Amino acid sequence: MVSNHGVERVIPLCTGNPIWRMSLKILIARLNHETNTFSPVPTPLAAFDPVYGEDAYQANLGMRTAMAAFIDLAEKAGATLITPLSAMANPSGPVHACAYDELTACILAAAPGCDAVLLDLHGAMVAENTPDGEGDLLERLRHALPTVPIGVALDLHGNITQKIVDNSSVIVGFKTYPHVDMYETGEHTAQLVLAMLQGKSSYSVHWHPLPLMSHTLRSTTLYGAMRRAVQTACAGEGPELPAISVFAGFSLADIEAPCVSVVITCLNSLNGKALAEEMCDHLAKQIWAERAEFVYVSEPLSDSMERALVLAIDADRPVLLLDHSDNCMSGGTCDTMDVLQAAVSHGLKNMAVGPLCDPQAVNIMFKAGIGSKLDIALGNKVALNPQGLVKQPMQIKGTVRALSEGTYTASGPIYTGQLCSMGRTVLLETDVASIVVTERPHEPFDIGVFHIVGLDPSTYRFLLLKSRMYCRPVFEPLAHALVECDSPGPTSSDYSLFPFTRVRRPVYPLDQM
């Protein structure tokens, strides 16, 4: 039965579950956006590639998203699934007000009559008409469903707010960055909500925010203070504290508190609440004592290039160059040319590069066709507000080697099974580099970004990617060494480039504390 944007899918009830005398209805939806309020990249409705109803259900089957886990566990439990929406946009500027209103209205329209809600959200969405996209949605859902369990799976980079906490029954955040536990986070969330539906448990949510704006490159769980914080959280989980999450926050958002926080879902008992308060305080003190380790200090770009050249001597695998100041998954344009220009000027050769986003150049190269030799202006076509930087495109001579419609299926481990679209895609070959140029900004989190144009990145001396962390599970094992490259891009780690006016002060490291 389809109503509005929702589809009702009835699964036979599991046997041996006398508590459920009829099929319970569970609303399951996905709405993901991490907002960089300084990004010049717009976020209209089309950026989300939204799918509705039955299509939303089908789009998540076989994937490793939190929503996919919700579907799997709810079906196993014998619930009736309502799947009004699945929508995800790459990080970019504030969500257009009309897009936010339409997407949230779709979820809200499906809420009446539901016995539980499972939401796959990000936690750092800012729209033109609200600084707290998730909090406002959850508040309206709670008003519509005052007594039903609402479980939320969130990204590790969520900017948690009072509204998010007050209107959620269960909150679970990713425990990895790069994010390779999306599905597991969804499982965790769904298990707790199903326990509530079966009358086995009741939960309370506790929150401890810190005045700490972490740099994204220091929020990885591969090493350092964030890894230790997550290890403490995992060690503390148990029957009375079933979910302990450490959120690094997303600092490139000019809102009240784009900060680190600790969120605990605990048993709704005196002892459970007391343990939650104790653990929140313990984790917050641990993080604050190591706050300096959440700050990233970059080296000059010229030093990075010289270091890359030294590392490449006698290397039998590529040296990985990460252009993290123009990272698509933090709101970058994938358009800045600083790092590629520096690489060329320092004499780096035999490079695989990409994806660079330049729809104008793509259009020219598609019209020219495979085999065409061109002298083309590439990149630096999007103004880098708020820095006000206007740069000239890089003039490049090369040959069009491959053309593609730019669609591939991610092989994982990030977004496994997801259909990805880079728009029309070109492989441009120059004397020193093979460059993948796309119509849409796209994070290189999957080997498919190169394979789609017939390029094997492992055969090059240098591999230049516009990425911070998402690329690492796939590309770091292929590399001899890794060099992080900074520049004045839209996702730079240099906070002085961004005019924060709404952030509550004092806050570290903007202020010495």
Regions found by a protein language model. Give the residues of each.
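Extended hydrophobic packing segments that form well-structured cores
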Residues: 64, 83, 288, 407-513
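Low-complexity, highly charged intrinsically disordered N-terminal segments
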Residues: 72-104
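N-terminal amphipathic/basic leader segments beginning at the initiator methionine
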Residues: 23-73
